């Protein structure tokens, strides 16, 4: 049986008691006059991991950036529709984008530690936000959550750039955790990592997914199947003028998407017959 709407998980007993953390309502994104993502309506469950999959150019990362208004920083970008967080559209004129980004953190594809010490990488965000608690305790907690503390506890004053690629990415995750977000966005967080580092990040994601709402963009379907609870499949469409834009095809529990998808194009993509 097909779900009633592509952005709503099916109504099975496993899905019945889900709490929605974030919701997009008919969200479209434009770069100048070019439509990049069309009319996406999607409900993201709280304290679960949701994966966005689909071919290049289907709007996964563009939509991800809508959740913390990072598209605001791209010249010519425009978002239509609503992104609902705690009952309010984050694009309303009275909403502070900086506060949105504090509550909805983003980890980029390539590790990007600041040219500062490991300690100051973690402490930077809380300091900027006026944190009044014990900073040493906060730094340790964030590094422990990112499963990095035991590796760096004796060299907190050394540069974050001295760490390996996998350690740098976990440092960036710890930096995000230190601002105490409710939602963590991850844009291909393992794309530049070796298989061992990737496995550690995936194990970390599974642990964090119990306490945070996580949305991950990935081209690695095996990764989506391993770590996510829900999966949204996006595909491209060509408009009348020959320009491509992204659209949501199907959203459901990950096992449904990979084992019994409702749409043929989803099945073709996850089975490797796409294109």
Swiss-Prot record:
It comes from the Bacteria. It is found in: Cell inner membrane. Residues 22-261 form the ABC transporter domain. SUPFAM superfamilies: P-loop containing nucleoside triphosphate hydrolases. GO terms for cellular component: plasma membrane. It is an enzyme of class 7 (translocase). GO terms for molecular function: ATP binding; ATP hydrolysis activity; ATPase-coupled phosphate ion transmembrane transporter activity. GO terms for biological process: phosphate ion transmembrane transport. It holds the Pfam family ABC_tran. Keywords: ATP-binding, Cell inner membrane, Cell membrane, Membrane, Nucleotide-binding, Phosphate transport, Translocase, Transport. It is a peripheral membrane protein. ATP binds at residues 54-61. It catalyses: phosphate(out) + ATP + H2O = ADP + 2 phosphate(in) + H(+). The complex is composed of two ATP-binding proteins (PstB), two transmembrane proteins (PstC and PstA) and a solute-binding protein (PstS). Belongs to the ABC transporter superfamily. Phosphate importer (TC 3.A.1.7) family. Part of the ABC transporter complex PstSACB involved in phosphate import. Responsible for energy coupling to the transport system. This is Phosphate import ATP-binding protein PstB 1.
């Amino acid at each position: 049986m097909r779900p009633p709407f592509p952005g709503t998980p099916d109504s099975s007993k496993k899905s019945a008691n889900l709490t929605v953390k974030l919701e997009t309502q008919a969200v479209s994104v434009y770069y100048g006059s070019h439509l990049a993502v069309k009319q996406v309506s999607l409900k993201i469950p709280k304290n679960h991991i949701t994966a966005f999959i689909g071919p290049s150019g289907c709007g996964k990362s563009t939509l991800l950036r809508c959740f913390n208004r990072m598209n605001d920083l791209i010249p010519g970008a425009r978002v239509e529709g609503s992104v609902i967080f705690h009952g309010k559209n984050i694009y309303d004129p009275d909403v502070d984008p900086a506060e949105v980004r504090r509550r909805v953190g983003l980890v980029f594809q390539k590790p990007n530690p600041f040219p500062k010490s490991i300690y100051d990488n973690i402490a930077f965000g809380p300091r900027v936000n006026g944190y009044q608690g014990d900073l040493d305790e906060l730094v340790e907690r964030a590094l422990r959550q990112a499963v990095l503390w035991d590796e760096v506890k004796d060299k907190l004053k050394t540069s974050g750039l001295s760490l390996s690629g996998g350690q740098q990415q976990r440092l960036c995750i710890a930096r995000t955790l230190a601002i105490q977000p409710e939602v963590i966005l991850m844009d291909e967080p393992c794309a530049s990592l070796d298989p061992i580092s990737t496995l550690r990040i995936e194990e970390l994601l599974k642990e964090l997914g119990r306490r945070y709402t996580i949305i991950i963009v990935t081209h690695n379907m095996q990764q989506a199947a391993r770590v996510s609870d829900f999966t949204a499949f996006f595909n491209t469409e060509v408009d009348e003028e020959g320009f491509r834009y992204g659209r949501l095809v199907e959203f459901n529990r990950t096992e449904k998407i990979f084992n019994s998808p409702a749409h043929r194009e989803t099945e073709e993509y996850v089975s490797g017959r796409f294109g």
